[in-house]
A protein has these predicted regions:
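N-terminal helix-cap/turn-to-beta initiation motif at the start of protein domains
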Residues: 80-83, 105-120
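Glycan-association/targeting regions that enable binding to alpha-glucans and other polysaccharides
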Residues: 22-30, 92, 101-104, 173, ...
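Ser/Thr/Gly/Pro-rich, low-complexity flexible regions
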Residues: 112-239
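Serine/threonine-rich, repeat-prone extracellular segments and beta-strand-based repeat modules
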Residues: 64-104
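Solvent-exposed, low-complexity, repeat-rich "mucin-like" stalks and linkers
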Residues: 34-66, 160
Length: 239
């Protein structure tokens, strides 16, 4: 799945299922406890259209060579009536009460909304230190996710287009979560932002920030930390 999912809530893509055994010692005796292995059918991350019916591809669970699929508990938050990121958790406890689990991420997108979906920054996007004038290119394409919230408002999982989260490898806490508004003519305004890892936000979004529907591009400059300008060009990623 798309690289931006790294920055989506670290999320939900994490597979915890495993098969193993471990020794337990009690009163001078050593026992072995076995864990189940849960294997997903299909992808661990799936994209489905808003308003469609989601069908779980299923899974298989085994423990000590025995099929225990029917003993797995499935918990799902998937709601295809609303765009968003959802999870399905599959879990099973062994005879000793130890849990094995794995999960699937389901991203619900309005496929009729041209803005909603995955976007990739161009490698020539760049960060400028306004104190020194030094500019550094992104050097690679990093993907982000934009989800509609209604009324022309959109949630962006990383307004910095992966600079810290993906390029620097800092992880999800250093993605700049943001809410933007896109007007009918394509003008973009910033309604709010937040970087959890540093507890701060963007200083400003450039007045010329623009969504070009015909070219399927988004261009903007976001000022951060008082002296860093991130000049970003995004291209829509076809699913």
């Amino acid at each position: 799945m798309k690289k931006s999912i790294i920055c989506l809530v670290s999320l939900l893509c994490l597979a915890l299922g495993f098969t193993s055994c471990e020794k337990k010692q009690s009163a001078g005796k050593t026992d072995i406890t076995y864990y189940a292995e849960i294997v997903l059918n299909g992808d661990a991350t799936m994209v489905v259209g808003k308003g469609t019916t989601f069908v779980d591809p299923g899974f298989k669970a085994t423990m000590k060579g025995e099929d225990v699929t029917d003993k797995v508990t499935v918990t799902s938050t998937v709601d295809t009536s609303t765009s968003g990121i959802y999870s399905i958790t599959y879990s099973i406890a062994n005879a000793d009460g130890f849990l094995a689990s794995t999960s699937r991420t389901v991203i619900v997108l309005d496929l009729t909304d041209p803005v909603e979906g995955f976007w990739a920054c161009t490698p020539t996007s760049y960060r400028t230190n306004t104190n020194t004038g030094d500019a550094v290119a992104y050097g690679a394409s990093f993907e982000i996710l934009i989800i509609g919230k209604g009324g022309g408002n959109y949630e962006v999982d990383d307004l910095l287009a992966g600079w810290y989260c993906q390029r620097a490898g800092y992880g999800t806490n250093y993605a700049m979560q943001a809410i933007i508004n896109i007007a009918d003519g394509g003008a973009i305004t910033l309604l709010g932002s937040y970087v959890p890892g540093w507890g701060d936000a963007a200083d400003a979004l450039s007045a010329d920030a623009k969504y070009d529907a015909a070219a399927k591009k988004i261009n903007y400059t976001v000022t951060y930390a008082g002296y860093l300008d991130f000049t970003v060009e995004l291209n829509k990623v076809d699913l």
